[in-house]
Amino acid sequence: MGRLSWASPIQRFRFFSYLSQLNGRRSVLACSGYENRYLSSLVEASDCELDEVPDDRKVAEKDTALHLALSQLSGDFDKDSKLSLQRFYRKRRVSVISTGSLNLDLALGVGGLPKGRMVEVYGKEASGKTTLALHIIKEAQKLGGYCAYLDAENAMDPSLAESIGVNTEELLISRPSSAEKMLNIVDVLTKSGSVDVIVVDSVAALAPQCELDAPVGERYRDTQSRIMTQALRKIHYSVGYSQTLIVFLNQVRSHVKSNMHFPHAEEVTCGGNALPFHAAIRLKMIRTGLIKTANKISGLNVCVQVVKNKLAPGKKKSELGIHFGHGFYVEREVLELACEHGVILREGTSYFIEGEVIEGKDAAEKYLVENKEALDTVVAILRNQLFKM
């Protein structure tokens, strides 16, 4: 190789290349050239610091071209082609509906479930999915909204809904006979813009019309997935122009996979991949234990995992307690959060709630159960502090 000299930024170098034998002799090719070497950091810094001076004429040309393109779009297409961020997002803070649990609202990061989006709640049987859906309906009705419950499982219990606090007289309930009818109802109600919450219970129970008409035993591969894919594209378009919250309840199935001679079971949701894709938020509910009172099972503990969240950081968890026949243990978590944030004062075992001195945690929870006005006041103060609403 040639010897290089680093004495100057521009240097001369020489190298030799031995090629294969030609006509019995070895040919030698000699080349020379120049190479730039900048050894000073000052030269590199000066190159990076030289920014192009803004040209007002180019900026004006770009602005004129943009206005011409927008004028062409408005003339050639309908109003939906209008490019404007404020047209779709008029408020910086998204409108939400509470889940009925402050702990879960905190895990979601925005204070609840967003309007104008689709949400998937999935888990195994008896994990609290229906209870969560009824609490969402209850919170929406508090705000004066209309709600619809589409019961594909034929398992809606009006007495349970009323015990949780749902006004069943103002609740729209439907039991469509097929998946196509169910999803068409969702699309029509969403386009109307008059319904605040739509609950579909559940995706796993949606039966395509072809399966209902065929005898038992015939297989229709991926029919439900294809129907969900087509329908959710329409619903996703409709929900973008409304303030409707659509909650899909779903179940999980065990799918056995083989990995290099080691088969293992993997949990998958029903209905294919369309719903996980279109859903802005996905919640997974897991039973973690039972609640016993006087040696009797009175409820269960569940863990809600935020698997997907397009509005805030995801992968958070929330521990909830469900009282059979009454819904969430709201008073317990409100008392804990209120003491933590100074809304309710606690000294030892004494609690100071609205001028009342109450001894013991159980007595304080009972006081909140019996005094709904005090509970609502504490919840309002907490939501104002936690979410700055």
From Swiss-Prot:
ATP binds at residues 123-130. It comes from Arabidopsis thaliana (Mouse-ear cress). Its main location: mitochondrion. Pfam families: RecA (PF00154). The lineage of its organism: Eukaryota, Viridiplantae, Streptophyta, Embryophyta, Tracheophyta. Involved in recombination ability and DNA strand transfer activity. GO terms for biological process: DNA recombination; DNA repair; mitochondrial genome maintenance; response to heat. The keyword DNA-binding applies. It is found in: Mitochondrion. Residues 1-15 form a transit peptide. Keywords: ATP-binding, DNA damage, DNA recombination, DNA-binding, Mitochondrion, Nucleotide-binding, Transit peptide. Belongs to the RecA family. GO terms for cellular component: mitochondrion. This is DNA repair protein recA homolog 2, mitochondrial. GO terms for molecular function: ATP binding; ATP-dependent DNA damage sensor activity; single-stranded DNA binding. The keyword Transit peptide applies.
